[in-house]
Amino acid sequence: KNNDLPDLLSTTRLARLYPDEFEDLGQYVDTSIFEPQALQIISQNYLTDKLSVLPQQFTITNVFYNKDAFEAAGLECPTVDDRWTMDEVYEAAKKLQDSGAVKYGMAMDASRARYDNLMYMNGGSLVEKDGDSFKVVADSQQNVDTLQSFVDANNSGVMPKAIWAGGSSDNPGDYFKNGDVGIYFSGSWNYNPFVQDITSFKFGVMPSPVGSAGGSAILGGAGLAVPTNAKNKDLALEFLKWFYTDKN
């Protein structure tokens, strides 16, 4: 609003809030180097074909699991070719808990960055395109079914109930690191800390579950953008052309 943005910036949503204030970067780089889904999630202006942002990083949900607990409960990790549904995840979580190998079968960060993927797996969304605008569809049957399954699992005690019920500030990541949780939905950024911190058991990352509409692991992320009024716009665009090549 103050017209004082840098020539090149990393942003999650500025370019969508003010699309006319940023360059269309699709004309400067070869967008075929990106997965189409990545462009849609990070870069696409939903009302036009303009690419105001080029993907830089993603918000990805990993499904961590306690290998030792799986072995104790007689469970095998799903494969890429035979991924679990969320119903199967809930069932496995109950088996883990019932086996006594862990206190809680599963846990999930109290964040939309985790839950919304469950919604997308079943073809749900909070809004959908309606002509040149959007309409709210938060109460669609897909969303209701997804939420009910999650609430039922949470109420059953297979998860640390208070984390999503709002009665606790506990970090579910600590539960997993302590060996109290069998399956943990969290950010991919937790992988390196877990490698450093977890020494009492072996852990892994399982393939993302699928729903009736497929899988979903990427909720959003950030990308690089260039303001149309940037002082050194040409230099910023040259950098992006150099940066977004296979070599670099």
Give names to the regions the model predicted.
Residues 1, 83-88, 163-177:
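Short helix-initiation/N-cap motifs at beta->coil->alpha
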Residues 1-16, 30-34, 77-78, 188, ...:
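Conserved N-terminal structural module of periplasmic/extracytoplasmic solute-binding proteins
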Residues 8-62, 87-90, 118, 204-206:
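Hinge/lid segment of periplasmic solute-binding proteins
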Residues 24-37, 79-82, 124-145, 196-197, ...:
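Short, solvent-exposed loop/beta-turn-alpha elements that line the ligand-binding surface or hinge
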Residues 49, 156-158, 195-248:
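Extracytoplasmic/periplasmic substrate-recognition and gating elements
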Residues 52-53, 97-110, 245-248:
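Bilobed periplasmic-binding protein-like "clamshell/Venus-flytrap" ligand-binding domains
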Residues 62-65, 119, 224-226:
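Short glycine- and hydrophobic/aromatic-rich loop-to-beta-strand nucleating segment
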Residues 90-95, 132-165, 208:
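Glycine-centered hinge/linker elements that transmit conformational signals in sensory
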